[in-house]
Amino acid sequence: MAMTYHLDVVSAELQMFSGLVEKIQVTGSEGELGIYPGHAPLLTAIKPGMIRIVKQHGHEEFIYLSGGILEVQPGSVTVLADTAIRGQDLDEARALEAKRKAEEHIKSSHGDVDYAQASAELAKAIAKLRVIELTKKAM
């Protein structure tokens, strides 16, 4: 049997996931993180993107995170997300529209602040579309 640890994914609105997992993949402030059983303790910021959860027996779940904090302790991992949305709950049409608007905003930006904000919005829209795509593949 594969080694596991307990994972909690919590947003301000609700507890999104709680259970045993084999591993997770998430984007931290320093880059991509793969958290396996026995990982060293860690506290890091999470960038907007997805968390890939590999549950017991290899079943996968994808959740969009708008950012937050990841805490790794012996035997347990906690994700405190600003916003968390399951892949099947994301609206593909709205994500595509947000991507289009962000791309337009980038083209028409007139300063570093405008460009940075538009780039962040584009990254969020692309992350949502990636979560939707991976969720469809996993079904």
Swiss-Prot record:
<keyword id="KW-0139">CF(1)</keyword>
<dbReference type="GO" id="GO:0005886">
    <property type="term" value="C:plasma membrane"/>
</dbReference>
<dbReference type="InterPro" id="IPR036794">
    <property type="entry name" value="ATP_F1_dsu/esu_C_sf"/>
</dbReference>
<dbReference type="Pfam" id="PF00401">
    <property type="entry name" value="ATP-synt_DE"/>
</dbReference>
<protein>
    <recommendedName>
        <fullName>ATP synthase epsilon chain</fullName>
    </recommendedName>
</protein>
<dbReference type="GO" id="GO:0005524">
    <property type="term" value="F:ATP binding"/>
</dbReference>
<keyword id="KW-0813">Transport</keyword>
<keyword id="KW-0406">Ion transport</keyword>
<dbReference type="InterPro" id="IPR036771">
    <property type="entry name" value="ATPsynth_dsu/esu_N"/>
</dbReference>
<dbReference type="InterPro" id="IPR001469">
    <property type="entry name" value="ATP_synth_F1_dsu/esu"/>
</dbReference>
<keyword id="KW-0997">Cell inner membrane</keyword>
<comment type="similarity">
    <text>Belongs to the ATPase epsilon chain family.</text>
</comment>
<keyword id="KW-0375">Hydrogen ion transport</keyword>
<keyword id="KW-1003">Cell membrane</keyword>
<dbReference type="InterPro" id="IPR020547">
    <property type="entry name" value="ATP_synth_F1_esu_C"/>
</dbReference>
<comment type="function">
    <text>Produces ATP from ADP in the presence of a proton gradient across the membrane.</text>
</comment>
<keyword id="KW-0472">Membrane</keyword>
<dbReference type="GO" id="GO:0046933">
    <property type="term" value="F:proton-transporting ATP synthase activity, rotational mechanism"/>
</dbReference>
<dbReference type="InterPro" id="IPR020546">
    <property type="entry name" value="ATP_synth_F1_dsu/esu_N"/>
</dbReference>
<keyword id="KW-0066">ATP synthesis</keyword>
<dbReference type="GO" id="GO:0045259">
    <property type="term" value="C:proton-transporting ATP synthase complex"/>
</dbReference>
<comment type="subunit">
    <text>F-type ATPases have 2 components, CF(1) - the catalytic core - and CF(0) - the membrane proton channel. CF(1) has five subunits: alpha(3), beta(3), gamma(1), delta(1), epsilon(1). CF(0) has three main subunits: a, b and c.</text>
</comment>
<dbReference type="Pfam" id="PF02823">
    <property type="entry name" value="ATP-synt_DE_N"/>
</dbReference>
